[in-house]
From Swiss-Prot:
Pathway: Metabolic intermediate biosynthesis; chorismate biosynthesis; chorismate from D-erythrose 4-phosphate and phosphoenolpyruvate: step 4/7. It catalyses: shikimate + NADP(+) = 3-dehydroshikimate + NADPH + H(+). Its EC number is 1.1.1.25. Belongs to the shikimate dehydrogenase family. The lineage of its organism: Bacteria, Thermotogati, Thermotogota, Thermotogae, Thermotogales. It comes from Thermotoga petrophila (strain ATCC BAA-488 / DSM 13995 / JCM 10881 / RKU-1). GO terms for molecular function: NADP binding; shikimate 3-dehydrogenase (NADP+) activity. This is Shikimate dehydrogenase. GO terms for cellular component: cytosol. NADP(+) binds at residues 115-119. The keyword NADP applies.
Length: 253
């Protein structure tokens, strides 16, 4: 079978390397490629992708757009974002990755979620499934945050530091930090947190600062990616536990 990841940009993705190594170790004759699709070309290119590939993963900024072209699962419908597709059906495995990556960790409230895109939707849905009720969303545009359609309080980005100061947990669902940028959160506000979670799967300044300041629980996106990838392979019907652990644990855990 043929798989790929679609996004823009997508050159930073470690998915092709990991999945192809997994296929090799498991003795599977599958391939996993990369398709960089600018937003303005999406409607044309997605039709080709659906014809050419058995399955694919969608990342920023395409998780919400994909919904229009696939038959979404119940979870994906509620989240309004798809990150895993198999033969015309769309799933959201991000939220599963969030829940599993937080096993054994108490998510203390209030919880601040930075961002209002596809990843934010999955994080909020996961938190609600875990019984978290007091969720505060901080986003650059208030209108986009309102469109989330979840029971959350909404704040603008210029309120981020004062909101974090009153919170116990912080989830960054944006790409801020991928290139070394920092969220506008003071050290004093960060220090008062119990949990810091960043969906970016390598160490961002937020994660480094939280560790240095002694935040009790600091979770990188690599754990979310690990469990999300496991779920993807199960959906595609090609999960092999031993090969998965050999390849994915080596890199991600």
């Amino acid at each position: 079978m043929k798989f790929c990841i679609i996004g823009y940009p997508v050159s930073h993705s470690i998915s092709p390397r990991l999945y192809n190594e997994y296929f090799k170790r498991a003795g599977m004759n599958h391939s996993y490629g990369m398709e960089e699709i600018p937003p303005e070309s999406f409607d044309t290119e997605i039709r080709r992708i659906l014809e050419e590939y058995d399955g694919f993963n969608a990342t920023i900024p395409h998780k919400e757009r994909v919904m229009r072209y696939v038959e979404p699962s119940e979870d994906a419908q509620r989240i309004k974002a798809v990150n895993c597709v198999f033969r015309g059906k769309g799933y959201n495995t991000d939220w599963v990755g969030v829940v599993k990556s937080l096993e054994g960790v108490e998510v203390k409230e209030p919880v601040v979620v930075v961002g209002a895109g596809g990843a934010a939707r999955a994080v909020i849905y996961a938190l609600l499934q875990m019984g978290v009720k007091d969720i505060w969303v901080v986003n650059r545009t208030i209108e986009r945050a309102k469109a989330l359609d979840f029971p959350v309080k909404i704040f603008s980005l210029d309120q981020l530091d004062e909101v974090v100061k009153k919170a116990k947990s912080l989830f960054n669902t944006t790409s801020v930090g991928m290139k070394g940028e920092k969220l506008t959160v003071s050290e004093a506000s960060l220090k008062g947190l119990y949990l810091v979670y960043d969906v970016v799967y390598f160490e961002t300044p937020l994660v480094s600062d939280a560790k240095r300041l002694g935040v009790e629980h600091v979770v990188k996106g690599n754990l979310m990616f690990y469990y999300q990838a496991m779920e993807n392979l199960k959906i595609w019907g090609i999960y092999d536990e031993r090969s998965f652990k050999e390849v994915f644990e080596e890199v991600l855990r």
